[in-house]
A protein has these predicted regions:
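Short, acidic/polar
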Residues: 36-48, 116-130, 196-200
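Alpha-helix N-cap and loop-to-helix initiation/capping positions
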Residues: 36, 40, 69-73, 77, ...
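Phosphate/pyrophosphate-binding loops at sites that engage ATP/ADP/AMP, CoA/4′-phosphopantetheine
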Residues: 86, 125-134, 204
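Beta/alpha (TIM)-barrel catalytic core signal, keyed to glycine-rich beta->alpha loops juxtaposed to Asp/Glu
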Residues: 9, 144-298
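A general structural detector for well-ordered alpha-helical segments in enzyme core domains, enriched
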Residues: 44, 74-81, 123, 127, ...
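N-terminal binding-site loop/beta-alpha segment at the start of enzyme catalytic domains
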Residues: 1-97, 134, 179, 265
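Structural preference for beta-strand elements that scaffold enzyme active sites
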Residues: 22-26, 54-55, 91-95, 135-140, ...
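N-terminal small/glycine-rich loop or linker at the start of catalytic domains
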Residues: 16-35, 95-111, 140, 144-154
């Protein structure tokens, strides 16, 4: 058992209006199956649980950076770990995500530009099978079906809008999963204030399951959440699950001297190893400049 000094179990937080109670620290797993092999991933999971952490987050798309060869790998690794530790499952809150439209990943639902009700139901069943569990505690939409300026984007471009499954139909599909006992609570990720408001108001209007959470990036080098999403979540009773709280490692200080690439850069670090990650929000020169200044204050 974890010692009381290291345990987080006495600080449980309720997720939105759901029944889920989680530790303030959630173990993100998106590197499992890419940078982290299965035996190492299992040791990390053991380490977290031994210290009282009860909250795990994954996704059908993982590992990252996304590749055809590692699609679904993270859920499978977690499922294998759970199978070897059957008594652990009841202690945990396991969150996973259904991928949104393909964004160039043609190995996800054949590159479809939409996610239908059938896709929601089939994706959930597939995640349950990979995770080797009979229920997903928190099922999230990884990114919106409609066009939004996500993953480092800033400005909304209405000319990029395309017809997709309406938010009401998405809610109805998720509600079916809850009523079927396959999902306990639902959430969103990489969402906007508009999207959160629509999901909440339509759920209330039609008597459907209300979203409990929004998982968006939030840290000292990415504060876009403060541009209205924080107020929206507060007033609508939706919890925030901030991801990348250390800015993909920028706020650890490991890039301060060397920069992201070149001599002295940490060879196995994500922003050094994967160009795709540098091209998005975390590899921008201004992000590293800001991180260095924050790290100097720490």
């Amino acid at each position: 058992m974890p010692s009381s000094e290291n345990s987080f179990t006495n600080k449980l937080v309720q997720l939105g209006s759901s029944c889920l109670q989680v530790t303030p620290i959630c173990l993100g797993t998106m590197t499992f199956g890419e940078q982290v092999d299965e035996p190492t991933a299992h040791r990390i999971l053991d380490f977290a649980v031994e210290r009282g952490i009860n909250f795990l987050d994954t996704a059908e798309m993982y590992a990252v950076p996304p590749r055809r060869e590692t699609y679904n790998a993270t859920e499978k690794i977690i499922g294998n770990w759970l199978a070897k530790r059957p008594d652990v499952r009841k202690q945990l809150v396991i969150a996973t995500k259904i991928a949104g439209p393909s964004r160039g990943m043609d190995w996800i639902r054949n590159g479809s530009a939409d996610v239908t009700e059938k896709d929601f139901l089939e994706a959930c069943d597939a995640s349950l099978k990979r995770l080797q569990t009979d229920v997903i505690d928190l099922y999230q939409i990884h990114w919106p079906l409609r066009h939004v300026p996500a993953f480092g984007g800033v400005y909304f471009d209405p000319t990029k809008d395309k017809p997709v499954t309406p938010i009401l139909a998405q809610l109805q599909a998720l509600d079916k999963l809850v009523k079927a006992g396959k999902v306990r609570a639902i959430g969103l990720s990489n969402e906007t204030p508009y999207g959160v408001s629509e999901f909440v108001h339509l759920a209330e209007k039609h008597g459907l399951t209300k979203i409990a959470t929004v998982q968006n990036p939030y840290c000292l080098v990415n504060r876009t959440l403060e541009n209205g999403l924080d107020e929206t979540m507060h007033r609508l009773g939706v919890s925030n699950i901030p991801y990348s709280p250390l800015g993909f490692g920028l706020l650890t200080g490991k890039y301060d001297k060397s920069g992201l690439i070149g001599e002295g850069a940490p060879a196995n670090a994500r922003l050094t190893k994967f160009e795709q990650n540098r091209k998005q929000r975390w590899g921008r020169p201004e992000s590293l400049v800001a991180a260095r200044r924050y790290n100097a204050l720490a």
